[in-house]
């Protein structure tokens, strides 16, 4: 979802240098405070609707609860199309900012969560990743997605949800197993 928020900013406010540092923090350290500010300032669910229409993301749906941007529904094809858009259609300066931020993802997100599961936990660099994690009354979610290989040759996406009560270590191990299974083809 944070990639959709970033792409919406690029489309609607392309000449906004102060947003560059904020977007960099939101994407690399998965900073929820920045995402919350941009979500509220730019129309919340309309961000998903606008960006999904512009990028032709067939499964993208805004969250049922307006303020829970992390509950936005995206299919794997939507995530792949989003990365392709960044690579092929985003303005060069913004593309570089987005890719540099994703490639600089620190081990721990701004909330202290260990982001090195899935792609960064299993695959060697180069990679540029956007990790996702959340708990809700319905499930525990852990996603890893990104670009890997020289020249960002491959898009890798693993979207995983687990029963309520699943601990993060168990979820991360399962996501790591999925990426490990994909690794020989990369």
Task: State each model region's role.
Residues 1, 32, 151:
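Short, flexible active-site-adjacent loop segments at beta-strand->alpha-helix junctions, enriched
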Residues 1-15, 26, 156:
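Active-site SXXK
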Residues 6, 28-32, 79:
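Acidic/polar active-site rim loop that often engages polyanionic ligands
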Residues 11-25, 30, 42-45, 94:
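Short, well-structured active-site flanking segments
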Residues 29, 33, 86-89:
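Alpha-helix C-capping/helix-to-loop hinge sites
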Residues 40-186:
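Penicillin-recognizing serine hydrolase domain
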